Amino acid sequence: GSIPACGESCFKGKCYTPGCTCSKYPLCAKN
């Protein structure tokens, strides 16, 4: 798997950094 590299946590299932998703819950990861 890839390493989360978005520097934020999921918030209510969403990530606010462009190109990032909550696929590595509870962390955001590059989509």
From Swiss-Prot:
GO terms for biological process: defense response. PROSITE patterns: CYCLOTIDE. Disulfide bonds join 6-20, 10-22, 15-28. This is a cyclic peptide. Belongs to the cyclotide family. The presence of a 'disulfide through disulfide knot' structurally defines this protein as a knottin. This is Cyclotide vinc-B. It comes from Viola inconspicua.
